[in-house]
């Protein structure tokens, strides 16, 4: 997205998720320096979920949080603003024009909405990698929360996800059930490895790290699908459905419960758009075009 001519990345707010806030913030800076965009403002956001301690991620991304690629230490400084305030200020400066892409727990956005409730009327839309909605056989096979039903971003801060989903903000959720159905093939990995572009080489290294740990390349693609849904909305077919977030379940904390019933549906649940299916070939083409160009 930062390199796309179709969009303008106005800022990044880090948040505690797979790793503590200091590591995630540093990794944002490293990534922006890697792609030659150190000018994009980075603000450090929430260091813990709204009401819970930050859980340890059972799916390790290596000691650096990026698949053991060990990018150089960043020289760019973070913004003086808090990550929550950066969201508020950017949206306020561009009412009706800003899409907020969330590829981490929704803590920052939830805090922004609590601080400035009017924000829900000013954001163009939210597109998030969040949940799993039971729409194919992969729905819970690749669950990333610390239980068989939850996706990590919602599991980490289910209260934040519930607040955002219930806020009335225009929202598209890309679930794991749709996002985990595609991988890079050998030819694509070869192109990345042999590219003259450093960022392409880095993506290939990330995939190789995952393969050594017994995982597939979709693990580095799922967040990209949320970005691709903004760059090219026709890539992903959405369906509107009522969705609830489990915040109290002993075995199902963080589960996103989609109510598809025609009769006796839970009318109190918010209606949101969730991914039904994707054009995976086109998604990979868009991804490769953006990495290799």
Where are these regions (language model features)?
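Short N-terminal helix-initiation segments at or just after the protein's N-terminus
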Residues: 44-47, 104, 219
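Active-site histidine-anchored catalytic micro-motif
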Residues: 1-30, 64, 70-173, 179, ...
């Amino acid at each position: 997205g930062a390199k796309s001519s179709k969009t303008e990345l106005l800022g990044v707010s880090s948040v505690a998720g797979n790793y503590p806030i200091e590591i995630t913030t540093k990794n944002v800076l490293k990534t922006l320096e890697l792609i030659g965009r150190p000018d994009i403002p980075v603000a450090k956001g929430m260091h813990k979920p709204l009401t819970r301690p930050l859980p340890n991620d059972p799916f390790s991304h290596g000691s650096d949080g990026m698949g053991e690629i060990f990018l150089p230490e960043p020289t760019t400084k973070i913004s003086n603003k808090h990550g929550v305030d950066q969201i508020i200020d950017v949206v306020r400066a561009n009412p009706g024009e800003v899409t907020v892409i969330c590829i981490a727990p929704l803590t920052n956005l939830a805090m922004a909405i609590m601080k400035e409730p009017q924000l829900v009327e000013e954001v163009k839309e939210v597109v998030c990698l969040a949940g799993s909605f039971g729409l194919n056989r992969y729905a819970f096979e690749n669950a990333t929360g610390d239980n068989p039903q939850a996706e990590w971003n919602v599991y980490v801060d289910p209260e934040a996800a519930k607040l955002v989903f219930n806020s009335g903000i225009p929202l598209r959720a890309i679930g794991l059930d749709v996002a985990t159905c595609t991988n890079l093939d050998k030819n694509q990995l070869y192109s990345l490895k042999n590219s003259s572009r450093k960022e392409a080489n880095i993506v290939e290294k990330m995939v190789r790290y995952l393969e050594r740990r017994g995982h597939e390349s979709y693990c580095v693609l799922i967040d990209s699908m949320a970005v691709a849904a903004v760059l090219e909305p026709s890539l992903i077919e959405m369906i509107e459905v009522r969705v609830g977030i489990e915040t109290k379940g002993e075995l199902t904390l963080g589960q996103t419960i989609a109510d598809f019933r025609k009769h006796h549906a839970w009318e109190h649940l918010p209606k949101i758009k969730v991914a039904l299916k994707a054009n995976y070939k086109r998604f990979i083409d868009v991804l490769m075009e953006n990495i290799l160009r």
